[in-house]
Amino acid sequence: MKAQPKASHFIGGAFVEDKAGKPLPVIYPATDEEIASLYSATPGIIEAAYAAALKAQGEWAALKPVERGRILRRTAEILREKNRKLSKLETLDTGKALQETLVADAASAADALEFFGGIISGFNGEFVELGGSFAYTRREALGICVGIGAWNYPIQIAAWKSAPALAMGNAFIFKPSENTPLSALALAEAYKEAGLPDGLFNVVQGYGDVGAALVNHRLTAKVSLTGSVPTGRRIMAQAGEQLKHVTMELGGKSPLIVFDDADLESAIGGAMLGNFYSTGQVCSNGTRVFVHKNIRERFIERLVERTRKIRIGDPFDEATQMGPLISAAQRDKVLSYIKKGKAEGATLACGGGVPKLQGFDKGFFIEPTVFADVTDTMTIAREEIFGPVMSVLEFSDEDEVIARANDSEFGLAAGVFTADLSRGHHVIGQIKAGTCWINAYNLTPVEVPFGGYKQSGIGRENGIAALAHYSQIKTVYVEMGKVDSPY
């Protein structure tokens, strides 16, 4: 097969197989072709991963932070050296255009490893003077952390979660999405090549039952999930029973607000980036595009013109700008939302169908879609679609659009396009969302935290904040005089 790995799992520094597990076929979304055959983790595989992690974690945490950081930075170098190879693997696994995976996947993973490897030696506790005595705090590792990944950015998510965890001295067990299991194994090999001690980064494959087993395992100190809100609720409930630490990066239905003084081409570019990149399969996408009534017609006319020029096709052709959705089930789901949008009265401005592509008739492709005349109560304006479907809504004034933007159970992201930066800051200050942009959209440098409000999540990925989520604070009080006791 095109992308068959050495084995399904990576445990204790080596590939491991157990064919007693449930078969896990890997499908190339552009052709519906099976490119690899793996097996879901058995209880024995899961226990082996925990045994390896437990054995390695203590010595790793005892290393100087600068020594841990050096290995992470070397891993980043290896990923960059192998970027093209890894990008091709990610394109096979996800169907995303190679044009995109070359710059957004392994490259972002390398950025995370480099960032956390560089800052960990300066991530220290506090010193508090208390007169004749003093106190200090220590940031200590949690132990064994679990990451559960999504299928839109497999290697990026694996690195975004494991880099801060490992930097802090934890061991890590990662379960990729069953749809995209391959690149996490490649990341494990890169860690090994960089000198990461065996057992610190383990990959176990599987379906939801494997994820549940990891969450519920007695040795799991923390769970970090990237996934849907329903999955997040289940994992929160499971983790809560044992008071485990959690980070939840969940779904969104984010607003992107375009005022009438905005640079039109820039705003349209931001809206397209925030709806069509990765074939619309991005949790932070600004799928509710609020456009001021004064520029609505010009905005939609130019948006449709540019959207129709998006090149859909062979993901390995570097001129291709959009590949397929991840699966037939996901395409069917997106098409059902398009049907619902039309039925509820939205105007289909462009797209909405399945393109005919020579040689890719079995692929899970869909046209980038724009709806106009969308109202706040329509299903396509309320629910996360996770596909290339943009809803354009009209607004008249600032207070109105702020209220409408906030009228959602989600709060992952938001964007504002305006020439008036004072207004931009004011509006963003009123929006209930965790990750926001002014005159940009969906740019996520690893140096800054990423995460949401409300039903969109708990905790943060990236930035110094991520290190806090993979550590616990120990307070030490030091008495320099005699104990003052009433006894």
Swiss-Prot record:
<keyword id="KW-0479">Metal-binding</keyword>
<feature type="binding site">
    <location>
        <position position="384"/>
    </location>
    <ligand>
        <name>NAD(+)</name>
    </ligand>
</feature>
<dbReference type="InterPro" id="IPR015590">
    <property type="entry name" value="Aldehyde_DH_dom"/>
</dbReference>
<feature type="modified residue" description="Cysteine sulfenic acid (-SOH)">
    <location>
        <position position="283"/>
    </location>
</feature>
<dbReference type="GO" id="GO:0019285">
    <property type="term" value="P:glycine betaine biosynthetic process from choline"/>
</dbReference>
<feature type="active site" description="Charge relay system">
    <location>
        <position position="461"/>
    </location>
</feature>
<dbReference type="Pfam" id="PF00171">
    <property type="entry name" value="Aldedh"/>
</dbReference>
<feature type="binding site">
    <location>
        <position position="251"/>
    </location>
    <ligand>
        <name>NAD(+)</name>
    </ligand>
</feature>
<comment type="function">
    <text>Involved in the biosynthesis of the osmoprotectant glycine betaine. Catalyzes the irreversible oxidation of betaine aldehyde to the corresponding acid.</text>
</comment>
<dbReference type="InterPro" id="IPR016162">
    <property type="entry name" value="Ald_DH_N"/>
</dbReference>
<keyword id="KW-0520">NAD</keyword>
<keyword id="KW-0521">NADP</keyword>
<dbReference type="GO" id="GO:0046872">
    <property type="term" value="F:metal ion binding"/>
</dbReference>
<feature type="binding site" description="covalent">
    <location>
        <position position="283"/>
    </location>
    <ligand>
        <name>NAD(+)</name>
    </ligand>
</feature>
<comment type="pathway">
    <text>Amine and polyamine biosynthesis; betaine biosynthesis via choline pathway; betaine from betaine aldehyde: step 1/1.</text>
</comment>
<protein>
    <recommendedName>
        <fullName>Betaine aldehyde dehydrogenase</fullName>
        <ecNumber>1.2.1.8</ecNumber>
    </recommendedName>
</protein>
<feature type="active site" description="Proton acceptor">
    <location>
        <position position="249"/>
    </location>
</feature>
<dbReference type="InterPro" id="IPR016163">
    <property type="entry name" value="Ald_DH_C"/>
</dbReference>
<feature type="binding site">
    <location>
        <begin position="228"/>
        <end position="231"/>
    </location>
    <ligand>
        <name>NAD(+)</name>
    </ligand>
</feature>
<feature type="binding site">
    <location>
        <position position="27"/>
    </location>
    <ligand>
        <name>K(+) 1</name>
    </ligand>
</feature>
<feature type="binding site">
    <location>
        <position position="243"/>
    </location>
    <ligand>
        <name>K(+) 2</name>
    </ligand>
</feature>
<feature type="binding site">
    <location>
        <position position="454"/>
    </location>
    <ligand>
        <name>K(+) 2</name>
    </ligand>
</feature>
<keyword id="KW-0558">Oxidation</keyword>
<feature type="binding site">
    <location>
        <position position="457"/>
    </location>
    <ligand>
        <name>K(+) 2</name>
    </ligand>
</feature>
<dbReference type="InterPro" id="IPR029510">
    <property type="entry name" value="Ald_DH_CS_GLU"/>
</dbReference>
<keyword id="KW-0630">Potassium</keyword>
<feature type="active site" description="Charge relay system">
    <location>
        <position position="161"/>
    </location>
</feature>
<feature type="binding site">
    <location>
        <begin position="149"/>
        <end position="151"/>
    </location>
    <ligand>
        <name>NAD(+)</name>
    </ligand>
</feature>
<keyword id="KW-0560">Oxidoreductase</keyword>
<comment type="similarity">
    <text>Belongs to the aldehyde dehydrogenase family.</text>
</comment>
<dbReference type="InterPro" id="IPR011264">
    <property type="entry name" value="BADH"/>
</dbReference>
<comment type="subunit">
    <text>Dimer of dimers.</text>
</comment>
<dbReference type="InterPro" id="IPR016160">
    <property type="entry name" value="Ald_DH_CS_CYS"/>
</dbReference>
<dbReference type="GO" id="GO:0008802">
    <property type="term" value="F:betaine-aldehyde dehydrogenase (NAD+) activity"/>
</dbReference>
<feature type="binding site">
    <location>
        <begin position="175"/>
        <end position="178"/>
    </location>
    <ligand>
        <name>NAD(+)</name>
    </ligand>
</feature>
<feature type="active site" description="Nucleophile">
    <location>
        <position position="283"/>
    </location>
</feature>
<dbReference type="InterPro" id="IPR016161">
    <property type="entry name" value="Ald_DH/histidinol_DH"/>
</dbReference>
<feature type="binding site">
    <location>
        <position position="93"/>
    </location>
    <ligand>
        <name>K(+) 1</name>
    </ligand>
</feature>
